[in-house]
Regions:
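Metal-dependent de-N-acetylase/amidase catalytic core
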Residues: 2-11, 89, 93-244
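Active-site rim/loop-helix segments in enzyme catalytic domains that contact anionic ligands
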Residues: 1-111, 137-142
Length: 244
């Protein structure tokens, strides 16, 4: 990819507020600045993501994270957002076919050229991430609309950064694996775009403030500056049976 406009209309599909900023905040900011249409979908409101119950009371976290995501998307320049409305931590136990059809309806409505989501392992191993990946794959297979791209880790990145992310508690399941095939998007963010991504993540303070305080601003910028995706062809056979 030589020009962000090559991605056309972008639909990004994620599990929790802050997933979008961590994994494709730079892409969305660049595309929005280039006047491309960008639509973000979030499956849950992240109401279980308690990091400091005194500062961000659990009973208020759903509302807090809604507001944080709204500010994050404003900073990124994204004006279209859809909630799927599922419970945090429960995506792998709901009716997968209903979720797939909900996403498929959004795909048909938006008619994206590019669809961004998690890799098969969910990146962090979180069950919600893995479920959203599976739903997205099947929604694209059913609709035949757009090209699906999944977040991709290179071996170089894993060697350089995985230990740090694990130490910070970001990996909740099996560690991510290296992507063996070619990359369709390979960005190293610098300058204003990295500043925007940093600000967007800082806006989600209930999730990022503690990490930023531990590692420091410069190290945090190093952790968030890479955005890599690989084209992912949906299976030709339905995959919903594996998701129930």
């Amino acid at each position: 990819m030589n020009d962000i406009k090559e991605l056309g209309t972008i639909l990004s599909i994620w599990a929790h507020p802050d997933d979008e900023a961590y994994l494709c905040g730079g892409i969305m900011a660049m595309a929005s600045a280039a006047q491309s249409r960008v639509v973000c979908v979030t499956a849950t409101r992240g109401e279980l993501g308690v990091t400091d119950p005194t500062r961000w009371p659990p009973e208020q976290l759903l509302t807090i994270r809604e507001a944080e995501l709204a500010e994050c998307l404003r900073i990124l320049g994204v004006t279209e957002h859809r909630w799927l409305g599922y419970p945090d931590g429960g995506c792998d136990s709901i009716d997968a076919d209903a979720a797939i059809e909900q996403i498929a309806g959004i795909v048909r409505d938006v008619a994206p050229d590019t669809i961004l989501t998690f890799p098969p392992d969910g990146q962090t191993g979180h069950p919600d991430h893995i479920a959203v990946h599976r739903w997205s794959v099947e929604a694209v297979r059913r609709t035949g609309i757009g090209t699906l791209h999944v977040f991709a880790n290179t071996q170089e990145w894993l060697d350089d950064q995985l230990a740090r992310w694990t130490e910070l508690g970001a990996i909740v399941g099996e560690p991510p694996i290296a992507w063996a095939g070619p990359l369709s998007i390979d960005l190293t963010l610098t300058g204003q775009v990295l500043d925007i991504k940093y600000a967007a993540l800082a806006a989600q303070a209930s999730q990022t403030e503690a990490v930023r305080a531990v590692v420091g601003e410069q190290a945090y910028r190093e952790l968030i500056r890479i955005e890599r995706f690989a084209a992912f062809a949906p299976q030709q056979a339905p995959v919903s049976q594996a998701m129930t």
